[in-house]
Regions:
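Hydrophobic alpha-helical membrane segments
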Residues: 93-109
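Core segments of transmembrane alpha-helices
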Residues: 60-77, 129-131
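N-terminal signal-anchor transmembrane alpha helix
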Residues: 14-33
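Membrane-water interface at the C-terminal end of transmembrane alpha helices
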Residues: 132-148
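Non-cytosolic membrane-interface motifs at loop->transmembrane helix junctions
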Residues: 11, 85-91, 116-126
């Protein structure tokens, strides 16, 4: 009888990381569907919300671009977790994705120290979310490093 660890060979931290990126992607789609009010609520900025109100196409295109990036990042996390076939440049890709999330999250602290007047609630919560995403990725990457 196989040991409990042998039953599920997938890396759970990277599966969670993939789900987090997919949730981010879905929230970006919700912003497109929800329109200007959703752009404002999620902190996309008044310029983006106003452009969406005017019916301009670029807010949806930019948001769709972010959605596609987040879905690709979810796929890379699933690949590194062992749930999808090995994607091109998997090790470099998952390390870069992890670094982007961590750096995006950590940027909060120098901004708090150097320009606290520019820190908005959006910057705080989005930075903390990205830092959390990055830490989950890092946890998983460390666990699978030798197999990448």
């Amino acid at each position: 009888m196989p040991a409990a660890a042998d039953v599920h060979p997938y890396n759970h931290a990277l599966i969670v990381a993939a789900v987090l990126s997919a949730i981010g992607a879905l929230l970006h789609v919700a912003c497109i569907a929800g329109g200007p009010a959703w752009y404002r609520f999620f902190g996309a900025g008044e310029r983006m919300a106003t452009a969406a109100e005017r019916g301009e196409w670029w807010p949806a295109i930019a948001t769709l671009g972010i959605t596609l990036v987040l879905l690709a990042w979810a796929a890379y996390a699933l690949s590194a977790a062992g749930m999808l076939p090995v994607l091109p440049l998997l090790k470099a890709g998952i390390v870069a994705i992890t670094a982007v999330y961590l750096l995006r999250g950590l940027i909060l602290f120098p901004v708090l120290a150097l320009k606290p007047s520019q820190v908005t609630p959006f910057i705080v919560w989005s930075s903390l979310i990205c830092l959390g995403y990055g830490l989950v990725h890092l946890w998983g990457v460390v666990q699978v490093w030798d197999t990448l």
